């Protein structure tokens, strides 16, 4: 079995409510693993994740980049 390389991770926290936001922004939050205020999610630091964060930068904040 091949070993999985450990890559960089990024932790994001939801700071804004998805209420009265477009469906695309709500779906992006779900894609990031966020669904309630002040919840945190640790994800791989990839260009696709960075793009998702950029789409909802007013609703999330980056807590940690490791």
UniProtKB/Swiss-Prot annotation:
Task: Tell me its family.
Answer: Belongs to the universal ribosomal protein uL30 family.
Q: Which GO terms describe its cellular component?
A: cytosolic large ribosomal subunit
Q: What HAMAP family does the entry give? A: Ribosomal_uL30_B
Please report the organism this UniProt entry assigns to the protein. Answer: Chelativorans sp. (strain BNC1)
Print the keywords alphabetically: Ribonucleoprotein, Ribosomal protein
Q: How does it assemble?
A: Part of the 50S ribosomal subunit.
Q: What GO biological process term is on the record, naming one? A: translation
Tree of life domain: Bacteria
**Official protein name in the record:** Large ribosomal subunit protein uL30
Q: Which gene encodes it?
A: rpmD
GO molecular-function annotation terms?
structural constituent of ribosome
Q: Which Gene3D superfamilies match?
A: Ribosomal protein L30, ferredoxin-like fold domain
């Amino acid at each position: 079995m091949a070993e999985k390389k450990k890559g960089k991770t990024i932790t994001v926290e939801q700071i804004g409510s998805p209420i009265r936001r477009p469906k695309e922004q709500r779906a992006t939050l779900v894609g990031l693993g966020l669904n309630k205020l002040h919840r945190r999610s640790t994800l791989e630091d990839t260009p696709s994740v960075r793009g998702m964060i950029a789409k909802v930068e007013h609703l999330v904040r980056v807590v940690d980049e490791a």
